[in-house]
């Protein structure tokens, strides 16, 4: 999944990544 260019916490990104 691609995360939008928003100031999201690393945990969020990481989880999706």
Curated annotation (Swiss-Prot):
UniProt KW NAD keyword: no
Tissue: Expressed by the venom gland.
First-listed, main subcellular location of the protein, grouped into a coarse class: secreted
Subcellular location: Secreted
Molecular function terms, GO-annotated: toxin activity
Keyword Secreted among record annotations: yes
GO CC annotations on file: extracellular region
Keywords: Neurotoxin, Secreted, Toxin
Family: Belongs to the scolopendra toxin 8 family.
UniProt protein name: Scolopendra 7913.19 Da toxin
């Amino acid at each position: 999944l691609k995360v939008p260019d928003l100031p999201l916490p690393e945990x969020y990104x990481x989880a999706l990544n």
